[in-house]
């Protein structure tokens, strides 16, 4: 490529806008993406137009070689194009998460049963009794009340038999919940119980956000497994494909960490540099996905096994995620649930 081509953009020698990439390649409505290319800004200080399918998105920043645009409500997965001076660029696919339920209050990952039904909390503020604690969203995205008698339902997990467990940060208890929505106490006395996760042997791990990870054996014996820096909100737990427990817990720092905890309870820093990291999940290749901020941008951050982090989904107010059938993901914000066709195979939570 010659100097003039580099200045003009190799594929923009005819003066038309050209898109080379969109980063990140997935977003929720309201999330911002960076469109990279050439000829993207018209002359005379006018702004380009950005279309996500049939819906126009707001332009936040525009330059000749990039445009930052906000994904509008109503956008769906499909091509984004940039228009300048009557010329329209090539299309470049952006995957847009589709809203499936709102008026909720999840504070951690949603959970899916073996049939693909989604379970999500309406957690409420500390000590607030709400009419419905957990909602069930079926495969047709019909939302129905599932559990009504729990204060501050926080984290949800299923064991290998399909039994549902829920933590309550109000009373430090983990409850078993039957398919008909009746509940019974499984383990008590765990402080401010937040995140929960099962290991391969079906021991249950519970994060008390004041600084302790508890391990509950299948005989219901409770052990102190590890101690961590306290969190201002909650611990979130997930096991890697190698069977190593990973924990996030937002603090007052803007440079928070992901912890790894080995089988002996020894705590290490797996990654440092996230803002308010919350729910987390692994794919089958060992990449870790965290609802967090990276470099001031909120969304889903992917951390590779060798420690490289990048924002792969843009979206405000994300608190958690769960991989779903069909190489997709369920994304939870502070008030809603979205479905994203992502092309990523999630790790089974009990393998």
Predicted regions and their residues:
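Residue-level detector of Asp-centered blade-edge/turn motifs that repeat once per structural unit
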Residues: 112-115, 158-161, 198-201, 239-242, ...
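Surface loop/turn motifs at the tips and blade-to-blade linkers of beta-strand repeat domains
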Residues: 99-105, 145-150, 185-190, 225-230, ...
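Beta-rich catalytic cores
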Residues: 106, 130, 149-152, 170, ...
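Ser/Thr/Pro-rich low-complexity tracts
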Residues: 1-119, 131
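Blade-level signature of beta-propeller repeat domains, shared across WD40, Kelch, NHL, RCC1
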Residues: 314-351
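Short glycine/acidic-enriched loop and turn motifs that connect beta-strands
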Residues: 41, 124-128, 171-172, 211-212, ...
């Amino acid at each position: 490529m010659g100097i003039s081509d580099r200045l003009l953009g190799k594929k923009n020698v005819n003066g038309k806008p050209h898109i080379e990439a969109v980063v990140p390649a997935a977003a929720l409505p309201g999330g911002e993406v960076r469109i990279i290319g050439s000829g993207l800004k018209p002359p005379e200080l006018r702004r380009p137009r950005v279309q996500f399918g049939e819906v126009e998105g707001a332009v936040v920043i525009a330059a000749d070689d990039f445009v930052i645009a906000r994904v509008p409500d109503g956008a769906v997965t499909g091509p984004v194009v940039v228009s300048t001076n009557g010329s329209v660029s090539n299309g470049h696919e952006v995957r847009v998460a589709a809203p499936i339920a709102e008026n909720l209050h999840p504070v951690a990952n949603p959970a899916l049963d073996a049939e693909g039904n989604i379970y999500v909390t309406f957690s409420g503020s500390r000590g607030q009794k709400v009419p419905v604690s957990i909602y069930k969203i079926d495969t047709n995205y019909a939302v129905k009340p599932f559990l009504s008698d729990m204060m501050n339902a926080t984290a949800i997990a299923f064991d290998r038999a399909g039994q549902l467990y829920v933590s309550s940060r109000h009373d430090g208890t983990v409850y078993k919940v039957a398919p008909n929505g009746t509940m019974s106490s499984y383990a008590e006395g765990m402080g401010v119980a937040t995140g929960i996760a099962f290991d391969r042997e079906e021991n249950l791990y519970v994060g008390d956000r004041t600084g302790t990870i508890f391990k509950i054996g299948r005989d219901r014996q409770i052990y102190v497994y590890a101690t961590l820096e306290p969190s201002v909100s909650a611990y979130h737990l997930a096991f890697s494909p190698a069977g190593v427990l990973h924990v996030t817990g937002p603090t007052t720092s803007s440079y928070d960490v992901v912890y790894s905890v080995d089988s002996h309870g020894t705590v290490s820093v797996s990654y440092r540099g996230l803002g308010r990291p919350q729910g987390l999940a692994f794919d089958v290749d060992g990449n870790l996905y965290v609802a967090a901020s990276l470099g001031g941008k909120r969304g889903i951050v992917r951390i590779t096994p060798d420690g490289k982090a990048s924002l792969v989904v843009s979206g405000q107010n994300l608190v958690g995620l769960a991989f779903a059938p069909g190489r997709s993901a369920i994304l939870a914000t502070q008030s809603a649930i979205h479905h994203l066709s992502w092309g990523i195979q999630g790790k089974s939570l009990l393998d």
